[in-house]
A protein has these predicted regions:
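Extracytoplasmic/peripheral linker and loop segments enriched in polar/acidic and small residues
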Residues: 311, 345-346, 396-413, 433-501, ...
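Aromatic- and charge-enriched surface segment that lines or borders ligand/interaction sites
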Residues: 72-119, 153, 243, 291
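Gly/Pro-rich hinge or "lid" segments in bacterial periplasmic/extracellular proteins
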Residues: 135, 150, 158-224, 228, ...
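Surface-exposed binding/hinge segments that line
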Residues: 102-104, 111, 115-178
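Extracellular/periplasmic solute-recognition and catalytic clefts
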Residues: 202-213, 230-288, 312
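N-terminal lobe/hinge region of extracytoplasmic solute-binding protein
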Residues: 28-78, 192-195
Length: 525
C-alpha cells in the first residue's frame, strides 16, 4: 500500500513538472483574421499569425533584417533580371517536403484572377505577373519555374534591387498544393491547415483565440524555444489592457491611447513605444460622388484636419503628423511635404472654407458623408475628432460607421464607402512599398484611383536602376498623390506594446514584426 502511494505521488509530481515545463507565449491580436490563406490575407491580424506558420524564400531575423529563408542562397544574373534560388531541406508540418514546385504553385495562385488575391501586385516585378492578374495571359506564363525540386528560377521584367524585400510578404509564401487540391477552400480549416514555418495550427476558436504549437518539421526547430503560442482576439483595447494586468497576456498588440500617461507612470519598464513604417490615413472613394472629380472638396476636408492636435491630445504616444504618405526613415528617400504643411491653422481654415464653397457646399447646404472605420477604440476616437473638426469648420454632417474587420475590408474592396479609415504598414524598406498601393486596378487600391500619369511614374521608377534618379521619380509620384488630395494622411504610426519582463528575444524594429520563433520565456522558478 505504501509503495502504491509513493508511486502515485511520483507520477503526479512528474505530470505536474511536465505541465509546468510547457513554454507558452500569450499574445493579443487586433482582430479575428479574415483569412489564413497566404495568398488571400490582407491585414496585420492575418500577417502576424502567418509569419509564425509559414516562411518564404527570404526571412527576417528578430530585428526585421533580411536573412535567407527557405532559400539558403540565391544567384542574380549579370543583367539583374534572372534570380535563381537554391532551397534548403524543408518540410510542411505534415512531413511532406517543400519543393520549388510549391512556390511556383503559390505564385501562380497569387496572380490568378480566379483566386482574387489583393496583394498580387507584390509580384508585378515578375515577368507577365501584371498581365496575368489583369486577365490577359495564362497563369502558366508567369516568369517562375522549378528547374528541380531544390531550384527556383524567377524572371523579372527589370532589375529590381528591392526584390528580396518583397519576398517576406505572405502572398509570396509557398502553399501545400497536395492539401489544397484535396481540400479546396476548406484547406485553411484548423484540421487541414499546414504550413512550413516554426509553428502549426492546433486550435482556432473564432472571435476568441488561435492556438499554435511548435512544428518539429521546421528547418530551424532546434532554435525555437516556445512550445505553444496563443493569439487572443483583442479589438477592445481597454479589455486587452485589463487582461494584461491580470496576468492573462504576456504581450499586447496595442494599448489604449488615453492610458499612455498612466502606463508610463506605472508600467514604464513594460511599455515599449517605437517608430515604425506605418501611415494612418483617411481614404476617399474616388469612384463616385461626392469625391470623384472633386479635388476642391477633398482638399477642403484635408486642410481642416488638425493633425498636430490629434497626435498631441488623442493618440498622444509620440506619433508624427503626416502630410505625405511615405513615412520618414525609408532608406534613400526624402518624403514629399505639400506647401500647406507649413501654413498656420488660420490660413488652412480660410483656404478650406473657400474651397468648400467652390465645391458647392456651405453650412446651409452641408456635405453629408459616411466615415467608415474598423472596430477599435483608438480608431473611434480619431474618427470622432475628425468628424468634429469638419463640423466646426465647415458644417459637414458626418455619420460614423464602425464594422468588424472582415466586414470593413469587404466594404473597402467593394467601394461601399465614402470616406474610410485606412492604414498602410511598409512591407520592405523602400518608398515603393507605399506608392505602388495606388496603381490603377491594384488589389489594395481601395480608394479607386485611376491615374495614368501616376501609373507611368511608378513604371518609370521600376525601370530606373540609378538610386538617386529612381527616388526622384518616386517623389514625383507621391507629390501627385498628395497634391491631388486623393487621400488624407493624418499621422505616422508608432508601435505600442506592453511586454512582460520575462519575455525575451524580441527586438524593437521599424517593421513592427515580432515573430514568435525568436521569443523566449524566462520566468524565475
Amino acid at each position: 500500500m505504501k509503495k502504491t502511494l509513493l508511486l502515485t505521488t511520483a507520477l503526479l509530481l512528474a505530470a505536474t513538472s511536465g505541465a509546468q515545463a510547457e513554454t507558452v507565449f500569450r499574445r493579443s491580436n487586433d482582430a479575428e483574421p479574415a483569412s489564413m490563406d497566404p495568398q488571400l490575407a490582407q491585414g496585420m491580424p492575418e500577417m502576424h499569425i502567418l509569419r509564425d506558420m509559414f516562411v518564404g524564400l527570404v526571412d527576417e531575423d528578430a530585428g526585421a533584417h533580411l536573412i535567407p529563408g527557405v532559400a539558403e542562397r540565391w544567384d542574380i544574373s549579370d543583367d539583374g533580371k534572372t534570380w535563381t534560388f537554391h532551397l534548403r531541406d524543408n518540410a510542411w508540418s505534415d512531413g511532406t517536403p517543400v519543393t520549388a514546385g510549391d512556390f511556383v504553385y503559390a505564385w501562380r495562385r497569387a496572380v490568378d484572377p480566379a483566386v482574387g488575391s489583393k496583394y498580387s501586385f507584390f509580384l508585378y516585378p515578375v515577368k507577365n505577373a501584371k498581365t496575368i492578374a489583369e486577365g490577359n495571359a495564362a497563369v502558366d506564363t508567369l516568369g517562375v519555374s522549378a528547374a528541380d525540386d531544390k531550384t527556383l528560377v524567377v524572371e523579372l521584367n527589370e532589375p529590381t534591387p528591392y526584390f528580396p524585400g518583397l519576398l517576406i510578404n505572405a502572398v509570396t509564401y509557398p502553399v501545400p498544393q497536395h492539401i489544397i487540391e484535396k481540400q479546396g477552400k476548406d484547406w485553411t480549416r484548423p484540421e487541414n491547415l499546414i504550413g512550413n514555418g516554426a509553428f502549426k495550427m492546433r486550435e482556432w476558436k473564432p472571435q476568441s483565440r488561435i492556438v499554435l504549437e511548435k512544428s518539429a518539421n521546421y528547418y530551424g526547430a532546434q532554435d525555437v524555444q516556445l512550445d505553444k503560442v496563443i493569439y487572443y482576439v483583442s479589438e477592445d483595447k481597454n479589455a486587452e489592457l485589463q487582461r494584461y494586468r491580470a496576468g492573462e497576456l504576456d504581450w499586447t498588440a496595442d494599448v489604449p491611447n488615453d492610458q499612455i500617461k498612466w502606463l508610463r507612470e506605472n508600467l514604464g519598464a513594460e511599455l515599449h513605444i517605437h517608430n515604425y513604417l506605418g501611415t494612418f490615413y483617411f481614404g476617399y472613394n474616388l469612384t463616385k460622388p461626392p469625391f470623384k472629380d472633386n479635388p476642391k472638396l477633398r482638399e477642403a476636408l484635408s486642410l481642416v484636419i488638425d493633425r498636430e492636435r490629434i497626435v498631441k491630445n488623442i493618440t498622444a504616444s509620440g506619433e508624427q503628423p503626416a502630410y505625405g504618405f511615405v513615412t520618414p526613415g525609408i532608406s534613400g528617400y526624402t518624403p514629399y511635404q505639400p506647401e500647406y504643411a507649413s501654413w498656420d491653422r488660420q490660413k488652412r481654415l480660410e483656404k478650406a472654407k473657400a474651397l468648400y464653397a467652390e465645391a458647392g457646399y456651405s453650412k446651409e447646404n452641408p456635405l453629408r458623408v459616411e466615415l467608415l472605420y474598423n472596430t477599435n477604440d483608438n480608431n473611434k476616437k480619431v474618427a470622432i475628432a475628425v468628424a468634429a473638426l469638419w463640423k466646426d469648420a465647415l458644417g459637414v454632417e458626418t455619420s460614423l460607421i464602425n464594422k468588424e474587420w472582415k466586414a470593413y475590408l469587404n466594404d473597402r474592396r467593394e467601394y461601399n464607402t465614402q470616406v474610410f479609415r485606412g492604414s498602410w504598414m511598409g512591407d520592405y524598406d523602400d518608398a515603393n512599398t507605399f506608392l505602388d498601393l495606388f496603381v490603377s486596378g491594384g488589389g489594395s487600391n481601395t480608394i479607386g484611383l485611376n491615374d495614368a500619369a501616376y501609373d507611368k511614374l511608378l513604371s518609370e521608377a521600376a525601370r530606373e536602376t540609378d538610386g538617386t534618379k529612381r527616388a526622384a521619380i518616386l517623389q514625383q509620384a507621391e507629390k501627385r498623390l498628395i497634391d491631388h488630395h486623393d487621400l488624407v494622411p493624418v499621422f505616422f504610426f508608432v508601435s505600442k506594446h506592453l511586454v512582460k519582463p520575462y519575455v525575451k528575444g524580441y527586438e524593437e524594429n521599424v517593421m513592427n514584426h515580432w515573430p514568435s520563433k525568436y521569443i523566449r520565456i524566462e520566468k524565475e522558478q
